[in-house]
């Protein structure tokens, strides 16, 4: 196992911890908000999906960096 492989694993591990925690918190808070105000569920769901997409973009950046490290 080369140092490059360890760097790739580290980048993916660290780069996906933050988005995973953020997505979990977003979903939990959205479910709480829908539970408190069911009439606003469409607006809450739309905002939640948009926020999840932004959080997931960080994990995709980590994937791109790890692929660059792996193959370049």
Stretches with model-predicted labels:
Residues 1-72:
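Hydrophobic alpha-helical transmembrane segments of small proteolipidic membrane proteins, enriched
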């Amino acid at each position: 196992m080369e140092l490059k492989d360890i760097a790739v694993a580290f980048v993916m591990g660290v780069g996906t911890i933050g988005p995973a925690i953020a997505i979990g918190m977003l979903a939990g808070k959205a479910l709480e908000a829908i539970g408190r105000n069911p009439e606003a569920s469409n607006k809450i769901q739309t905002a939640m999906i948009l926020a999840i997409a932004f959080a997931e973009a960080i994990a995709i950046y980590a994937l791109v960096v790890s692929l660059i490290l792996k193959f370049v």
